[in-house]
């Protein structure tokens, strides 16, 4: 990826991701072409924290129907980023 801001699309805020925040694990939706190294570099430079490890998962788009027409939602890639113990917490998840 050319620009690090193109790697991270948005944070994923769910019940499960809120529980993971207590362990300094944050969930992001990322570009499907991004790899773990690019995701780690993007989080470290944008938020100014140290990343311990990155776990990624690809989610296939679900089949959805609108009347008699069917189609698929887009595929997504999520990344769970674990910060080091001495790094600060990301506060943009707090509302």
From Swiss-Prot:
Keyword Chloroplast set for record: no
Coiled coil: none
UniProt KW Protein biosynthesis keyword: no
Pfam families, per database record: Ribosomal_L23
GO cellular component: ribonucleoprotein complex; ribosome
Gene3D superfamilies tied to this protein: 3.30.70.330
Superkingdom to which the source organism belongs: Bacteria
UniProt KW keywords: Ribonucleoprotein, Ribosomal protein, RNA-binding, rRNA-binding
GO biological process, one term: translation
InterPro entries recorded: Nucleotide-bd_a/b_plait_sf, Ribosomal_uL23-like, Ribosomal_uL23/eL15/eS24_sf
GO molecular function: rRNA binding; structural constituent of ribosome
Assembly notes: Part of the 50S ribosomal subunit. Contacts protein L29, and trigger factor when it is bound to the ribosome.
Membership in a protein family: Belongs to the universal ribosomal protein uL23 family.
PANTHER family hit by this protein: 60S RIBOSOMAL PROTEIN L23A
Job of this protein: One of the early assembly proteins it binds 23S rRNA. One of the proteins that surrounds the polypeptide exit tunnel on the outside of the ribosome. Forms the main docking site for trigger factor binding to the ribosome.
Protein name, entry field: Large ribosomal subunit protein uL23
Organism the protein comes from: Oceanobacillus iheyensis (strain DSM 14371 / CIP 107618 / JCM 11309 / KCTC 3954 / HTE831)
Gene name linked to the record: rplW
